[in-house]
Amino acid sequence: WSXSGDDDDDDGDSGDDDDDDGDDDSDDDNDADDDSGAEDDNDDDSGDENEDDTDDSGDDVKMIKPTTVMTGWMMTIADESSDDDNERDDTSDDSVGDDAYNDDSQAGELNSDSTYYDQLRSQGDVQSQQGFKNLQSYSNGFKVSSGLVATVVSTLACLFLTNLH
């Protein structure tokens, strides 16, 4: 085989053709490769989409952490308030305490129930106080009206007696 020039594709033609198809379009092929490079840039865009997905999953993990902290904080509040309820109630048995409530959900339910009954008790206190005030006003009104009736009756009796004479 003898080749003339710097032809490396062994097809017998001369020139700087390297793509084995006989024509001299290596510049165009390089442009096509550049286009595929642009497609590689599109692949980089898909890589950016993957990065966005990983960022979102990172945000999801961050969203879970405060919820866990908040749950622990709320359990602590429920435990402390159940201690207060047991100390405040003088009639409760000493054996009933935090040891009796192994499950935090039971302590939370009991705490919410005691809060509900505390609200009912305070409403009942307000209503009974209002009822007592109403009873006082009725009794005061009865005293005034009975006094007024007695005054009118005695005045009429005096007038009647004076007219007889």
Swiss-Prot record:
User: Which of UniProt's keywords are assigned here?
Assistant: Secreted
Annotated region Disordered: the residues are: 1-112
Q: Where is the composition biased (Polar residues)?
A: 103-112
UniProt keyword annotation of Secreted present: yes
Compositional bias annotation for Acidic residues: 1-58, 80-102
Primary residence: secreted
On the tree of life, the source organism's domain of life is: Eukaryota
Tell me the compartments it is located in: Secreted
GO CC terms of this entry: extracellular region
Expression across tissues is: Component of the acid-insoluble and acid-soluble organic matrix of the aragonitic skeleton (at protein level).
Question: What's the protein name?
Answer: Secreted acidic protein 2
| Annotated organism of origin | Acropora millepora
